[in-house]
Amino acid sequence: MKDLSVNLLLEFPEEHRVERVLWIDPGMRGLYAIDIRDANALPEFYQAEEIEKMRDAGEWRVVENDPWLLALADENISEVYRDKRDSAWETIRPLIFDQPAIFDAIARSEAVKRGMEESGVTKQTIYRFLRRYWQRCMNKIKTHIR
């Protein structure tokens, strides 16, 4: 697991799935990752032994070219999308830095409830914003780009 890093993409060819590493336990006990193509994906925890076993069996490989790793300057984004992006960012910003808790389903549910109360945004919208953030390089710029 020492050769893995946050934001790295892992392809599982047999399952036609690509997952982004969201967080790695400092004690190297495991990591959270999310499927970047699944519109309903949520972070999933993998034990270190499980990841290493799958790697040794050739079940996943590192993706060299990240489709979301492109530089976008603000001036190249329309004002409408910038406003939507900024609004989405302000909604999830208080939630995303509580790591690893935000990746846990129960803790995330509580955080989303607080986010709903503070922002007036629906649960579905907050989950959509979080998903986009996690799936698209964990970068503010790409939270609302299609």
Give the ranges of each region predicted by the language model:
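Secondary-structure boundary/capping micro-motif
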Residues: M1-R146
